[in-house]
Amino acid sequence: MAAYAAFKHVELYNVGKAKKRVLRAPGGGSSDIFGSEMPQTPRGHVKNRMASNIFAAEKDNGVKNNVRQGAHRFYFIGDAPRRGQKTVDSHNRLFGEPTRPITPAKNHMKSSIPFGGQNTEAAAAQKLLTTNGHYNGKSGSVSSASSSVSSSTENLKMNSGSRGVFRNMSTAPGSKSNPIPSVRDPACPLTPEPSIPEIPPPDVLPIDIPCKEIEVGDIPADNYTYNQSDKRDEAIQSRCDSGTNPEKPYSLNHMEGPADLQEPMHPCPDTLKEAAQQCKMDSRNPITGLGLNGDGVGGLKPKKQKNREGNPVTGEGYKPGANDFHQRADSSQGGTPIINKNRVPPGGYSSGLW
């Protein structure tokens, strides 16, 4: 029961309740694939832009295409031009309109402000005469002249207003024609007075600043003793009271009194030599066993006295009686002589054979 209750909603409630679907033809219900006799709805005319109509058959007059390829457009005989096209007048296009108003060119180099007693009409005529004479179209039109005269009249009205303002400004109490008398300031003197000298900026060198007498304070008592470096006698100077002494440098500010000549001149401490270390007779080198001889470094080996009277190669010339050389003793029995092993070998003791 558990399995049935868990899965009964999958298919049991949907039996007989499936969706009702109606299959349609690939081309629709009115497609002629299945032999339908229903009338087709007319489709809108779609222009094929890839097709050419040069060699096409002649169409009806109502559907004929009058536009041909190329920069120029031609029309068939009997065809009317397209609607909405205006007629072109060659005369107006080439020579302009016959009744075109005159447009006088403005002369920017001349001023329109009139000076003198001319009236408005004379000023307008003078302005027409001073123009460059360039006109667009045919001259002799009275309307253009009247328009220019009216514009000149407006300019004269504006200029007259500005001239009146200029006249009022020129008659003001502060103008040049009516100057206001100046009143002298009583605080300002008539004679010029020198001003306070400017303080130089801090970056100016001291040599550029003018010298000023500055009061010097009390002189220390030590400076009264010596005021020059060569005051003392050079004969009584020593290294102890000179500038080369590191312990007592020679200074002008702190100087000692004159030296007492009754005291003996003792040498400086840096000139004294240290006493030599006493030699210990029992000091020996632990490696060689020789004495250090008091030098504390290692000592020297004792020199062995050598007898240089004989020839070490041949053995001749040595004094008899020494341990290093013995004469050969011949046997009294006449036998083989006894060779002393202590004799000097041939080649000497320095030979590599021995």
UniProtKB/Swiss-Prot annotation:
Annotated region (Disordered), positions in chain: 85-107, 135-187, 222-257, 287-354
One Gene Ontology cellular component term attached to this UniProt record is: spindle
Q: What Pfam family is a match for this entry?
A: JUPITER
Where would one find the signal peptide in this protein? Answer: none
* Keyword Hydrolase included in the entry's annotation: no
Any single GO BP term: positive regulation of microtubule polymerization
Phosphoserine: residues bearing it: 30, 112, 141, 152
Q: Where in the cell is it found?
A: Nucleus; Cytoplasm; Cytoplasm, Cytoskeleton; Cytoplasm, Cytoskeleton, Spindle
Q: Where is the composition biased (Basic and acidic residues)?
A: 85-94
Residues that bear Phosphothreonine: 41, 99, 103
Question: Which sequence ranges are marked TM in the entry?
Answer: none
Source taxon at top rank: Eukaryota
- Provide the alphabetized UniProt keywords: Cytoplasm, Cytoskeleton, Microtubule, Nucleus, Phosphoprotein
List, as start-end ranges, the regions of compositional bias called Low complexity: 139-152
- What biological function has been recorded for the protein in this entry? Binds to all microtubule populations.
By what name is this protein known?
Microtubule-associated protein Jupiter
Organism annotation: Drosophila ananassae
